[in-house]
């Protein structure tokens, strides 16, 4: 499972010009689910994202987590993160989870984030979405478990 995380001032996701998820300061995570992933992988990634220290403290050092700043989380599914791009001029998605498995784990990830009492917004699995964000820094990390 991969989470491409971006520290944001604000972010939103729209479907057909309708905002379906929006956050203020926090993390936008683009979530990619692979065949071998399970709930344990989702839990591990969520723990890492919510505790990853990418927000600055009073000394301007990356020392605070999403939980520390009471930040918000926007989760957007993105199967293209599971692409193999090492060969050729076209990505291969052979390692991506099936849509049903990916949807199940995506929904599980969102539910578990809400259970942590985080402020959570989410896109819609499988939808054609437009994501807008103000990347703060920019600060972007690809976390894989």
Curated annotation (Swiss-Prot):
Q: Which UniProt keywords apply?
A: Cytoplasm, Hydrolase, RNA-binding, tRNA-binding
Output the InterPro entries linked to this UniProt entry: Daa-tRNA_deacyls_DTD, DTD-like_sf
**Primary location:** cytoplasm
Q: Where in the cell is it found?
A: Cytoplasm
> What reaction does this catalyse?
glycyl-tRNA(Ala) + H2O = tRNA(Ala) + glycine + H(+); a D-aminoacyl-tRNA + H2O = a tRNA + a D-alpha-amino acid + H(+)
Show the GO cellular component annotation of the record.
cytoplasm
Please name the GO terms of the biological process aspect recorded for this protein, alphabetically: D-amino acid catabolic process
Q: Write the Enzyme Commission number(s) for this entry.
A: 3.1.1.96
**Which Gene Ontology molecular function entries are recorded, alphabetically?**
D-tyrosyl-tRNA(Tyr) deacylase activity; Gly-tRNA(Ala) deacylase activity; Ser(Gly)-tRNA(Ala) hydrolase activity; tRNA binding
Report any Pfam family annotated for this entry. Tyr_Deacylase
Q: Which residues form a coiled coil?
A: none
Q: Where is this motif: Gly-cisPro motif, important for rejection of L-amino acids?
A: 137-138
Class of enzymatic activity (EC top level) = hydrolase
Per the record, the similarity remark reads:
Belongs to the DTD family.
* Subunit (UniProt): Homodimer.
Q: Which HAMAP family does the record match to this protein?
A: Deacylase_Dtd
**What does the entry's free-text domain comment contain?**
A Gly-cisPro motif from one monomer fits into the active site of the other monomer to allow specific chiral rejection of L-amino acids.
The protein's matches in PANTHER family, at most eight in alphabetical order, are given as: D-AMINOACYL-TRNA DEACYLASE 1, D-TYROSYL-TRNA TYR DEACYLASE
Q: What does this protein do?
A: An aminoacyl-tRNA editing enzyme that deacylates mischarged D-aminoacyl-tRNAs. Also deacylates mischarged glycyl-tRNA(Ala), protecting cells against glycine mischarging by AlaRS. Acts via tRNA-based rather than protein-based catalysis; rejects L-amino acids rather than detecting D-amino acids in the active site. By recycling D-aminoacyl-tRNA to D-amino acids and free tRNA molecules, this enzyme counteracts the toxicity associated with the formation of D-aminoacyl-tRNA entities in vivo and helps enforce protein L-homochirality.
Provide the protein name: D-aminoacyl-tRNA deacylase
Source organism per UniProt:
Pseudoalteromonas translucida (strain TAC 125)
